[in-house]
């Protein structure tokens, strides 16, 4: 699971799903299913009405589910032959759904209307590109940045992060900002909140910045045990196990899933999906680029997207809906939610994205990160691979085994998954 999509299951009380349709009588009825929360429901109610106004004769039913319920229900619907006409997709899951024949090939539509993809960030399309064309298109994209608590930095007399920071600078600051504030012998303020299991948010960026790679899908190799990668892992292990400046998930459990949002870490690495969650914070905060490593600066890029069911009875109408969903009007509306970067380059340079209510930060920073972004690996069996690697990493962060042993275990387990999915 990509971390930014975890937002739809954190603190969101959706009773299974929310379903509505915008009009009554129509010649064609389309169904669309999405993952999301209350704000997504509100914006898609408006967009549904807008779509029907510009597409007379089509009635649109949209259903929004929380993250876990969405995938559970989608599996049942697809297996039962009652899949929605259009449904949301996470790039990491895309190859598995395409391999099972659940997705309609979009290339014929794109070939007939090539201008539809003009102005879309090319890198946002990469995850959905297959040897025989597209079976899905991106809705939005995510890059990773460094968030920091200005109040904690001020209290400790530590200078704010800058775009010249290296990982060594971050580590030094994190050590100074890790404190036992009440003197009871237990750390209650950490330097950095970082997701230590899933690759998207933190450790992939560190590995890439050390010159390492993650996976070679073509040859079925997990590459996180290379010499360059081990230097990165030793750096991370130093912060977690030696400095104790990055809390483990067990240490954070009492504070919730996000230590930065909870106000117990001075810094946090996350994507734009966290901005709306941080807006109500009682502390002052800012954002900076990811620090540089020996091989430069790096961030992952991932996306959510849209697909059309291979069993739809209305492929042309479904394509019209997909075009609408990735078009300028919908992209402007979705940009104002503040959860992601729009795929339309022009929108990212407009007030619709750059000026977001209650979030006066440098939103352009997330777009600028595309210049040094690495595509999060997308391949069949990704979720199984990530789980296998994550299990091994958990053993390291809990102190059960040394990091070198955990990575050796992760590589072997990852390679087995890759072999089983070739």
What are these regions (language model features)?
Residues 46-120, 154-157, 257-259, 263-267, ...:
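Extracytoplasmic "Venus flytrap"/periplasmic binding protein-like
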Residues 91-145, 284-288, 352-368:
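Hinge/lid segment of periplasmic solute-binding proteins
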Residues 107-120, 163, 182-192, 212-231, ...:
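Short, solvent-exposed loop/beta-turn-alpha elements that line the ligand-binding surface or hinge
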């Amino acid at each position: 699971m990509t971390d930014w999509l975890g937002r739809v299951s954190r603190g969101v009380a959706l009773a299974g799903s929310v379903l509505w349709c915008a009009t009554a009588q129509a010649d064609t009825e389309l169904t669309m299913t999405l993952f999301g929360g209350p704000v997504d429901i509100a914006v898609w109610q408006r967009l549904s009405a807008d779509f029907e106004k510009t597409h007379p004769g089509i009635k649109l039913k949209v259903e929004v589910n929380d993250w876990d319920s969405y995938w559970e229900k989608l599996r049942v619907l697809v297996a039962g032959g009652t899949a929605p006409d259009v449904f949301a997709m996470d790039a990491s899951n895309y190859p598995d759904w395409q391999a099972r024949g659940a997705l309609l090939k979009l290339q014929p539509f794109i070939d007939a209307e090539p201008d539809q993809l003009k102005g879309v960030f090319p890198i946002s399309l990469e995850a959905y590109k297959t040897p025989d064309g597209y079976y899905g298109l991106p809705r939005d994209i995510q890059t990773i940045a460094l968030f920091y608590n200005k109040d904690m930095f001020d209290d400790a007399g530590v200078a704010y992060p800058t775009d010249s920071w290296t990982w060594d600078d971050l580590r030094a600051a994190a050590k100074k900002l890790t404190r036992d504030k009440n003197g009871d012998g237990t750390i209650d303020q950490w330097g950095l909140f970082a997701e230590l299991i899933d690759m998207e948010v933190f450790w992939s960026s560190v590995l890439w910045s050390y010159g390492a790679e993650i996976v070679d899908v073509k040859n079925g190799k997990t590459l996180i045990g290379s010499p360059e990668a081990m230097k990165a892992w030793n750096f991370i292990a130093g912060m977690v196990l030696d400095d104790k400046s990055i809390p483990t998930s067990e240490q954070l459990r009492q504070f919730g899933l996000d230590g930065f949002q909870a106000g117990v870490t001075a810094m946090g690495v996350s994507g734009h999906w966290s901005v709306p969650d941080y807006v109500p914070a009682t502390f002052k905060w800012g954002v900076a680029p990811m620090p540089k490593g020996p091989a430069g600066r790096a961030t992952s890029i991932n996306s959510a997207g849209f697909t059309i069911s291979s069993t739809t009875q209305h492929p042309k109408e479904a394509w019209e809906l997909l075009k609408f969903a990735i078009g300028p009007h919908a992209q402007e509306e979705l940009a104002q939610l503040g959860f992601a970067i729009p795929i339309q380059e022009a929108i990212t340079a407009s007030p619709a994205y750059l000026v977001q209510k209650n979030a006066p930060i440098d939103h352009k920073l997330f777009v600028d990160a595309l210049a040094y972004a690495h595509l999060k690996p997308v391949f069949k069996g990704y979720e199984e691979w990530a789980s296998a690697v994550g299990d091994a990493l958990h053993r390291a962060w809990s102190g059960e085994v040394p990091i070198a042993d955990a990575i050796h275990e992760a590589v072997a387990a990852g390679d087995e998954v890759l072999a089983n999915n070739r």
